[in-house]
Amino acid sequence: MSLSKKLTLDKLDVKGKRIIMRVDFNVPMKKNQITNNQRIKASIPSIKYCLDNGARSVVLMSHLGRPDGVPMPDKYSLEPVAAELKSLLGKDVLFLKDCVGSEVEKACANPATGSVILLENLRFHVEEEGKGQDPSGNKLKAEAGKIEAFRASLSKLGDVYVNDAFGTAHRAHSSMVGINLPQKASGFLMKKELEYFAKALENPERPFLAILGGAKVADKIQLIKNMLDKVNEMIIGGGMAYTFLKVLNNMEIGASLFDEEGAKIVKDIMAKANKNGVRITFPVDFVTADKFEENAKVGQATVASGIPAGWMGLDCGPETNKKYAQVMAQAKLIVWNGPVGVFEWDAFAKGTKALMDEIVKATSRGCITIIGGGDTATCCAKWNTEDKVSHVSTGGGASLELLEGKILPGVDALSNL
């Protein structure tokens, strides 16, 4: 699956055409009020491009929350998004109370030029994800014929398909892979994601450094193994470093995270790194706590001293930060996935913050810096560095699967150039 050879919105002739666009409007809500409109704002450039270039209509479809294939308009309706869109676009948005069926098809068949139409939550139909569960917890499975009909109805709502929902690209859902139209293009959000991940995965600048944090080795095995085939340097930090250090250095790790499953393959990982000539850097000192709480007693430890019984490492220490900075200073491309400490608590945030400062420094000297979604993207928001790095991915699961070397169904389904 080539990331750089996919049809993009700017290569489409949209004049006079009905555009059906998959967006990510899965926004946080409280009492049917949107609490953060970032994802809606992010979709505006693609929508505006279509309107500015004479599209007849832009029909928007999205999921919201996890209604699991059951209509729950009281809790998961996209109706509040229509009002938000109206104010961001400065034009009327027609909200439809369903996403498929004859009424919806009729409303989208012959719209006035420049119409913007928002469909109701795709996941009110079990045919979107293929499975779900009813309110009593019984499992629901969509029938193949009904999935076909659902996809056919969505396909009637436009002449051209645009996908701008990178965060759902790793899911083979109907709205991601089942729209049967001759031209299927990425929107501008998706395009930027694919451009940056292509820089890392298809033709990287070197030296290429991957920084991998997070808690469990077992969750990151695929990621580590795939990246060892791509990078020159790797930093392994966060909770999973304790498993490596215990196995490799026989370090006393006290009550720190230890991953039994992951421990079994530490030697394999090191052998692969050795074979590929990849240098892996681990932490050398730690900020410790006497319990897993924000107000825990704080201590220090090194690999040599070990972490005493009952204490746990929750961050890396100042010597480690210096060591990481030296490795980062050489890099021309950095991909960072996973924090290196419990950054949500100030006492254990210094390591991740120091890393972020170095990432910003690297970016300003021309290094390409890519932040994988999820917790690492949350760090960017916390320290206000989203515009001080090259790219912050909007998709936690999708970016992880790309870095693991997997094919993303939602990207694979787009037209090739």
UniProtKB/Swiss-Prot annotation:
Residue positions, PTM Phosphoserine: 2, 4
Reactions that this protein is recorded to catalyse: (2R)-3-phosphoglycerate + ATP = (2R)-3-phospho-glyceroyl phosphate + ADP
Listed GO MF terms: ADP binding; ATP binding; metal ion binding; phosphoglycerate kinase activity
Keywords: Acetylation, ATP-binding, Cytoplasm, Glycolysis, Kinase, Magnesium, Metal-binding, Nucleotide-binding, Phosphoprotein, Transferase
Subcellular location: Cytoplasm
Cofactor(s) the protein requires to work: Mg(2+)
Superkingdom, taxonomy of origin: Eukaryota
Sections of the chain in a coiled coil: none
Residue numbers binding Mg(2+): 215, 218-219, 375
Chief location of this protein within or outside the cell: cytoplasm
Sites bearing N-acetylserine, chain numbering: 2
Enzyme class: transferase
Protein residues bound to (2R)-3-phosphoglycerate: 23-26, 38-39, 62-63, 65-66, 122-123, 170-171
Function: Essential for sperm motility and male fertility but is not required for the completion of spermatogenesis.
Record protein name field: Phosphoglycerate kinase 2
Organism: Equus caballus
Gene, per the UniProt record: PGK2
